[in-house]
């Protein structure tokens, strides 16, 4: 006998209605393509009709690529990894995103790669914000002219080729002339100045990068520094991206009203990586086989350095790009490009380096196009005469090689010049404060070094700076508070010089 089953139509209809409501009818349109060819860090993909230039692509093995060439029948993409397991015929998915990186205060003191992932073994970095790797540079209205000094701690630069906050100053020279040393010294000198530093190593040896990081650690500079490193064994794509990552990390702080300093070491390697990518993508080569848009590669990076207007918080990004020359040839393609983009250049000479003049800065052909506006008054008061005397000395020195008998005035001028040249020499990783620099230059241009033998000059100056900081604090205080070389400060400095010179000459 069949039992009566109570069918409740209301309950059934409510269940059906609930199921209908839960049914997700959303249709996702995913842009998918197929790999035609892969190799040398480049993939050619069929399909992907809706892809954007610069869009991130995801391959089956989770390798990420960037679509760079959008051609009529295929897309050329560069891979941000080895991509060894990508096969012909495998599928590729367009992500709809442009390359971006996480940013934040927690990056300070860390070493990261071009994708802002930590490579220093200190664990993950927690951040909540992100920025596009390629951000537009601030416009004309968003900027103001450079007016604050960015002290490097090197006498030759701070006195004669001064750099301001928001400036772009190129460091150019042959290999092994101390370009990285100048940049690293500048970062060390920012200690206590409330400046965030970003050091970008592009295509360097891993041992060189480790050495720089150790220097920062030893000198307590890592706490305000971020290191972005893509070494020589990294793929061309990552070497090409590294400078933009460094700029994005610095921009985060700049738009928060902070001062930042970015060192790109070096842009020649980035240009070579970009040339490799472009040639493999079959883009037409131009001068020195670089692609036609290699100027834009560097201009869009360096234009992001700026001094922001008061409405945007007066933050700044100072850029120190480094470019390597071959046998001092500044007229090659990349050097001329970067010289024309930047606001001046510091030229390092192999001849001066080999002659023992270090930092090997050729003051004659180095310039700073906006720096004088950023010099403090005290430095301006003493630096003008220094530059003039060194220029006259360089001219006389060339002439003196041919002349046998020189008059007394010329001999004195040559002797003074040699002592001034000694005064500009500085040991690596020993930046000087502005007060010490002003005192040092004043000593040289006012003849206090003329009585000494040339080889005694550096010992005299080192000991004098120690004497000044322990016995004549009033002089340092006047310069710190007024930023001007007042009559009172000059009197104090003269007193110190007379006292110390007597002491030094009697003990020598």
UniProtKB/Swiss-Prot annotation:
Membrane topology designation: Peripheral membrane protein
Chief location: plastid
Site (described: Required for activity): 366
Subcellular location: Plastid, Chloroplast thylakoid membrane
Pfam families according to UniProt: ATP-synt_ab, ATP-synt_ab_C, ATP-synt_ab_N
Enzyme Commission (EC) number: 7.1.2.2
Catalytic activity line of the entry: ATP + H2O + 4 H(+)(in) = ADP + phosphate + 5 H(+)(out)
Top-level taxon in the UniProt lineage: Eukaryota
One annotated Gene Ontology cellular component of this protein: chloroplast thylakoid membrane
Binding site for ATP: 173-180
This protein's UniProt keywords: ATP synthesis, ATP-binding, CF(1), Chloroplast, Hydrogen ion transport, Ion transport, Membrane, Nucleotide-binding, Plastid, Thylakoid, Translocase, Transport
The UniProt record lists the keyword Membrane: yes
Nucleotide-binding recorded as keyword: yes
MF annotations from Gene Ontology: ADP binding; ATP binding; proton-transporting ATP synthase activity, rotational mechanism
Family as reported in the entry's similarity comment: Belongs to the ATPase alpha/beta chains family.
Quaternary assembly: F-type ATPases have 2 components, CF(1) - the catalytic core - and CF(0) - the membrane proton channel. CF(1) has five subunits: alpha(3), beta(3), gamma(1), delta(1), epsilon(1). CF(0) has four main subunits: a, b, b' and c.
PANTHER family with a match to the protein in the record: ATP SYNTHASE SUBUNIT ALPHA, MITOCHONDRIAL (PTHR48082:SF2)
Protein name as it appears in the record: ATP synthase subunit alpha, chloroplastic
Source organism: Chara vulgaris
């Amino acid at each position: 006998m069949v039992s009566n089953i109570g069918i409740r139509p209301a309950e059934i209809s409510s269940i059906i209605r609930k199921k209908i409501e839960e049914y997700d009818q959303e249709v996702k349109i995913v842009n998918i393509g197929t790999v035609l060819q892969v190799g040398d860090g480049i993939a050619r993909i069929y399909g992907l009709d809706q892809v954007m230039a610069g869009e991130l692509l995801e391959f089956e093995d989770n390798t990420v690529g960037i679509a760079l060439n959008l051609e009529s029948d295929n897309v050329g993409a560069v891979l941000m990894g080895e991509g060894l397991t990508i096969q012909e015929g495998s599928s590729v998915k367009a992500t709809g995103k442009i390359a971006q990186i996480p940013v934040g205060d927690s990056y300070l003191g860390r070493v990261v790669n071009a994708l802002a992932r930590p490579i220093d073994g200190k664990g993950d970095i927690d951040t909540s914000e992100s920025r596009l790797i390629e951000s537009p540079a601030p416009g004309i209205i968003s900027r103001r002219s450079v007016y604050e000094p960015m002290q490097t701690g090197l006498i030759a630069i701070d006195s004669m080729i001064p750099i301001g906050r928001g400036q772009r100053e190129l460091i150019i020279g042959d290999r092994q002339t101390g370009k990285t040393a100048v940049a690293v010294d500048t970062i060390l000198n920012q200690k206590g100045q409330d400046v965030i530093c970003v050091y970008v190593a592009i295509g360097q040896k891993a041992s060189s990068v480790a050495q720089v990081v150790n220097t920062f650690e030893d000198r307590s500079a890592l706490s305000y520094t971020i290191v972005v490193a893509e070494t020589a064994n990294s793929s061309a794509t990552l070497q090409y991206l590294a400078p933009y990552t460094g700029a994005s990390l610095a921009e985060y702080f700049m738009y928060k009203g902070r001062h930042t300093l970015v060192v790109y070491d070096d842009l020649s390697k980035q240009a070579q990586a970009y040339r490799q990518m472009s040639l493999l993508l079959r883009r037409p080569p131009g001068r020195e086989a670089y692609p036609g848009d290699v100027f834009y590669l560097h201009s869009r990076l360096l234009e992001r350095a700026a001094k922001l207007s008061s409405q945007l918080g007066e933050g700044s990004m100072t850029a120190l790009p480094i470019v390597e020359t071959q046998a001092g040839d500044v007229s090659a393609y990349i050097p001329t490009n970067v010289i024309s983009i930047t606001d001046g250049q510091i030229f390092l000479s192999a001849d001066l380096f080999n002659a023992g003049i270090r930092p090997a800065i050729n003051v004659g052909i180095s310039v700073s196009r906006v720096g004088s506006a950023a010099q403090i008054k005290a430095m301006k008061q003493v630096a003008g005469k220094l530059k003039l005397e060194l220029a006259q000395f360089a001219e006389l020195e060339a002439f003196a090689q041919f002349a046998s008998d020189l008059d007394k005035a010329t001999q004195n001028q040559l002797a003074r010049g040699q002592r001034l040249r000694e005064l500009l020499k500085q040991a690596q990783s020993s930046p000087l404060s502005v007060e010490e620099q002003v005192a040092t230059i004043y000593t040289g241009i006012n003849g206090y070094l003329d009585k000494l033998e040339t080889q005694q000059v550096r010992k005299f100056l080192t000991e004098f700076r120690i004497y000044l900081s322990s016995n004549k604090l009033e002089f340092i205080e006047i310069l710190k508070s007024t930023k001007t070389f007042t009559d009172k400060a000059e009197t104090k400095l003269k007193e110190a010089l007379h006292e110390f010179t007597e002491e030094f000459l009697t003990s020598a």
